[in-house]
From Swiss-Prot:
This protein is one of the early assembly proteins of the 50S ribosomal subunit, although it is not seen to bind rRNA by itself. It is important during the early stages of 50S assembly. It comes from the Bacteria. Part of the 50S ribosomal subunit. GO terms for cellular component: cytosolic large ribosomal subunit. One of its GO terms (biological process) is negative regulation of translation. This is Large ribosomal subunit protein uL13. One of its GO terms (molecular function) is mRNA binding. HAMAP family: Ribosomal_uL13.
């Protein structure tokens, strides 16, 4: 028996909407990353993008446990000497909560071209409104 390899025509993509209100960031990220990869489907293949689209709403209401809000930092390097920039999650959640949630989820995807392709299927919004009502997204509960 040969291994089944899904073709582009075989992949049926669905849209899910996830409410991040009072959900721990790590638990939210693992569930969403799993759906983006397609691990919930029987046709999952590690070397193909078979995942679904995910919309995360209320990104500003996500929870961080412990002292992560004050102590955890998001860093990036500008490329110049002394150009290591860092921002605490407390400041980041006030300034740009979408970036904090996106960074956590994309960090759990593969770090290659396939992971970048999967990350394009993620939409994160501040507040309960989103622009994807026409896609009829299913509500996904994360506890």
């Amino acid at each position: 028996m040969k291994t089944y390899i899904p073709k582009k025509d075989d992949i049926q993509r669905k849209w899910y909407v996830v409410d991040a209100t009072d959900v721990v960031l790590g638990r939210l990220s693992t569930e969403v990353a799993s759906i983006l990869r397609g691990k919930n489907k029987p046709m999952f293949t590690p070397n193909a993008d078979v995942g679904d689209y995910v919309i995360v709403i209320n990104a500003e209401k996500v929870k961080l446990t412990g002292k992560k809000l004050e102590q955890k930092e998001l860093r990036h390097y500008t490329g110049y000497a002394g150009g290591l920039k860092s921002i605490t999650y407390k400041d980041l959640m006030q300034k740009d909560p979408e970036r904090a949630v996106t960074h956590a989820i994309v960090g759990m995807l593969p770090h290659n071209s396939l992971g970048r392709q999967m990350a394009k299927k993620l939409r994160v919004y501040r507040g309960a409104d989103h622009d994807h009502i026409a896609q009829n997204p299913e509500v996904l509960e994360i506890k």
